[in-house]
A protein has these predicted regions:
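Conserved "HGTGT" condensation-loop signature of ketosynthase/thiolase-family condensing enzymes
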Residues: 1-135, 139-146, 151-228
Length: 228
């Protein structure tokens, strides 16, 4: 079957607060955005940008939409920050940080805003960027569990972790292009295997971003830099 990439976003960790849309639509849709931990802020920013490009709006009739998120460290940085607030006694523990000590909070926030009711879950991924999320998203579509899936990669590295890429990358895959010109067409075969219509195999989110050829979506934007 043919599926379509209808939205994509790359949000490097160092740039999340500089994006102008954070003060516009995203501020209106996520009134608590300023209280989110950084992990949730970056994830919501990327999902919102990709979903908006794909034509999704809060209240849109398409509800059978899911999100699969993968990453290696999850919300570990927030978990450590919360634990630090407990050291002087449990009565001083931060209730705000506690609210974000699970990596699935971010996708729950996004699904709630758009009214999505499809498969929504988090995977531990240590392979290529977003390969686990992309494979599961494709499989959910192939099995008929959803009409559209967002495959997402989100990574914030704790200070003790090896240096590497940080930020979020999100791809929107749909079975119907809704009369619009998609960013990319892909072939989805049995077993959830994805390939470009030219036959080139797609395994990671980076493969899709590279195929789109948009400098603003280049995977290299997520790589670590010496300066913010």
């Amino acid at each position: 079957m043919i599926v379509y990439v209808t939205g994509a976003a790359v949000v490097p960790r160092r740039r999340v607060r500089s994006f102008p849309y954070l003060e516009g639509e995203i501020a209106a849709r996520f009134p608590r955005f300023g209280r989110f931990d950084e992990y949730t802020q970056i994830g919501c920013a990327a999902v919102f940008k990709a979903a908006w490009q794909a034509g999704f709006r809060p209240g849109s009739p398409l509800r059978n939409v899911g999100i699969v998120l993968s990453g290696q460290y999850g919300s570990f940085e927030t978990d450590e920050a919360f634990y630090a607030t407990t050291l002087a006694g449990p009565e001083l523990a931060s209730p705000n940080l506690f609210s974000y000590t699970l990596p699935n909070i971010v996708i729950g926030e996004c699904a709630l805003q758009f009214g999505w009711m499809g498969p929504t879950y988090v995977l531990d991924g240590e392979g290529g960027r977003g390969d686990a999320a992309l494979a599961e998203a494709a499989a959910d579509i192939e099995r008929g569990r959803s009409e559209a899936m967002l495959a997402a990669w989100l990574e914030l590295r704790p200070e003790w972790a090896p240096r590497g890429a940080e930020g979020a990358a999100v791809i929107v895959i749909e079975t119907d292009r809704k009369g619009r010109r998609p960013l990319l067409e892909m072939d989805l075969s049995r077993g959830g295997r994805l390939a470009l219509t030219s036959g080139e195999r797609i395994v990671t989110i980076d493969d899709i971003l590279s195929a789109l050829g948009d400098p603003g979506l280049a995977p290299g934007l997520l790589e670590a830099r010496d300066t913010p």
